[in-house]
């Protein structure tokens, strides 16, 4: 997503879930054939170098979570916070998973991997 009206539509009609590392706005759409994602980091976070680093961290966290857990169709906006750039990356991914789980409810499936990164049977 790149256009302001798209972001405003998600903000107005979607659900908003805040975590320590980010804010996620979610507008699920079962009829859509694609998933659209937008990233926002305001000037409160810092100068352009810091904002771009924050945006890159959000983009990579989403890429990894989507690859591991899948992502349903709809529109998503990830809003970076001050803590996004300093937060441990594994915690940032957990924040994103938590926000998606809370915002999507039963539509979002949990990862079959345990905390160690191994399958459920091997995590013991």
UniProtKB/Swiss-Prot annotation:
GO molecular function, one term: ribonuclease P activity
Residue numbers spanned by region Disordered: 103-124
InterPro entries: Ribosomal_Su5_D2-typ_SF (IPR020568), Ribsml_uS5_D2-typ_fold_subgr (IPR014721), RNase_P (IPR000100)
Catalytic reactions of this protein: Endonucleolytic cleavage of RNA, removing 5'-extranucleotides from tRNA precursor
Pfam families assigned to the protein according to its UniProt record, in alphabetical order: Ribonuclease_P
EC number(s) on file: 3.1.26.5
Keywords assigned by UniProt, alphabetized: Endonuclease, Hydrolase, Nuclease, RNA-binding, tRNA processing
GO biological process: tRNA 5'-leader removal
Lineage: superkingdom: Bacteria
Annotated GO CC locations: ribonuclease P complex
Family: Belongs to the RnpA family.
SUBUNIT field: Consists of a catalytic RNA component (M1 or rnpB) and a protein subunit.
Function: RNaseP catalyzes the removal of the 5'-leader sequence from pre-tRNA to produce the mature 5'-terminus. It can also cleave other RNA substrates such as 4.5S RNA. The protein component plays an auxiliary but essential role in vivo by binding to the 5'-leader sequence and broadening the substrate specificity of the ribozyme.
Name this protein carries in UniProt: Ribonuclease P protein component
The species this protein was found in: Gluconobacter oxydans (strain 621H) (Gluconobacter suboxydans)
